[in-house]
């Protein structure tokens, strides 16, 4: 992942051929601050800093990623040509606020999980271009990463089964090539099948809390629960 390349693309997307409004202003050096409006967990400060620096500005970070902030705290101070600061402020703020929002919500959710063995993970359901930033924000908030890319681990889902014929046949193929693989199931019967056949991880897709509890008990009764990691 080339963060600098991605940040330059973000800037190009917003600035286009130039910030024609800021070009109306006289040349003037200024100092600007990014101030918080609410209680939050900071994430993305280093990327916001890099965005400003790519335009030739100087940045001093006062609240690093992972910092807990309250209203009116200063996250960073930016110094430099006013035109340059104004041309990239929105790109920097958008990424900083997005990542901080994700980190803040993740932190709140993690604190609600009473069972310390239970972990909160992010999925691949992210907007193109933002995956690495979103997943890093989840980690800063106390969560973990699921797959970043399709080449990291086999994950057999409903559409694969629809094309491939059956869950069992795909599991057997996966077992021949990979030590670790995940299976998404839609019912308890398939969860048991996946566990018996050696799935490392089983995703209980759209299971209600009641059905999750029932499935866990069935796996325990058949002495299969210890074999697998469950996701829901």
PLM regions with names:
Residues 206:
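Short secondary-structure boundary segments
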Residues 1-197, 201, 213-214, 218, ...:
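Acidic/glycine-rich phosphate/pyrophosphate-binding loops and surrounding catalytic core
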């Amino acid at each position: 992942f080339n963060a600098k390349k991605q940040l330059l693309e973000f800037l190009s997307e917003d600035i286009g051929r130039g910030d024609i409004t800021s070009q109306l202003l006289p040349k003037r050096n200024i100092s600007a601050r990014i101030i918080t409006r609410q209680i939050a967990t900071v994430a993305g400060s280093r990327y916001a800093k890099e965005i400003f620096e790519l335009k030739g500005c100087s940045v001093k970070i006062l609240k690093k990623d992972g910092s807990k902030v309250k209203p009116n705290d200063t996250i960073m101070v930016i110094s430099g040509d006013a035109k340059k600061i104004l041309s990239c402020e929105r790109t920097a703020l958008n990424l900083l606020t997005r990542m901080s929002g994700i980190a803040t919500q993740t932190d709140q959710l993690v604190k609600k999980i009473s069972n310390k063995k239970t972990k909160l993970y992010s999925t691949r359901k992210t907007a193109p271009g933002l995956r690495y930033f979103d997943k890093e924000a989840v980690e800063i908030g106390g969560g973990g990463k699921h797959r970043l890319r399709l080449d990291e681990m086999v994950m057999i889902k409903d559409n694969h089964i629809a094309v491939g014929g059956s869950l069992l046949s795909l599991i057997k193929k996966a077992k021949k090539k990979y030590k670790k693989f995940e299976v998404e199931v839609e019912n308890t019967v398939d969860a048991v099948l996946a566990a018996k056949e050696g799935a490392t991880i089983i995703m209980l897709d759209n299971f209600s809390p009641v059905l999750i509890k029932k499935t866990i008990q069935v796996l325990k009764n058949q002495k299969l629960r210890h074999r697998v990691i469950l996701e829901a």
